[in-house]
């Protein structure tokens, strides 16, 4: 399945290599990409651009991925968010669901899993 414009994905990670890896996974699928290195930058981009989905690292400087999702929800409503983290536990899963995260992916991410989950989130929210 190939994505059609104008779906835009915001990739937020404080690690430039991780951001670029995620961009290299989703951009060839036909998605526009925006990149942020912090929760604050992600909020600014979402406030000024049409963002259809967020791929967000859980551990960011200042605001966590979950805190960022909560603020975005107050500003724009629910935007499907896929959290990415190295430490999944039951409490994180509960908090992610309470903030309406679409899912939580474990690091290191699999290219095929990212593509599948992004497509499923876009289908669920926009089709």
Please provide the spans of the model-predicted regions.
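Two-component/phosphorelay signaling modules centered on CheY-like receiver
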Residues: 16-34, 99
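Residue-level signal for the "D+5" position in two-component response regulator receiver
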Residues: 35, 60-63
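Acidic catalytic/metal-coordinating carboxylates
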Residues: 38, 64-67
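Short amphipathic alpha-helix used as the core "switch/output" element in two-component signaling
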Residues: 44, 66-78
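Active-site beta3 strand of CheY-like receiver
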Residues: 49-55, 60
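Alpha4 helix (beta4-alpha4-beta5 surface) of REC/receiver domains from two-component response regulators
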Residues: 67, 88-104
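C-terminal output helix
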Residues: 91, 109-118
């Amino acid at each position: 399945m190939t994505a059609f414009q104008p779906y835009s994905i915001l990739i937020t990670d404080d690690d430039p290599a991780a951001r670029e890896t995620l961009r290299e996974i989703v951009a060839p699928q036909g998605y526009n990409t925006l990149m942020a290195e912090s929760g604050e930058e992600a909020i600014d981009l979402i406030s000024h651009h049409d963002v259809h989905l967020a791929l967000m690292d859980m551990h960011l400087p200042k605001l966590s991925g979950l805190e960022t999702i909560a603020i975005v929800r107050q500003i724009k409503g629910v935007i499907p968010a896929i959290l990415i983290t190295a430490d999944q536990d039951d409490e994180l899963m509960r908090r992610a669901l309470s903030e309406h995260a679409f899912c939580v992916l474990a690091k290191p991410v699999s290219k095929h899993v990212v593509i599948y989950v992004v497509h499923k989130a876009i289908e669920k929210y926009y089709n």
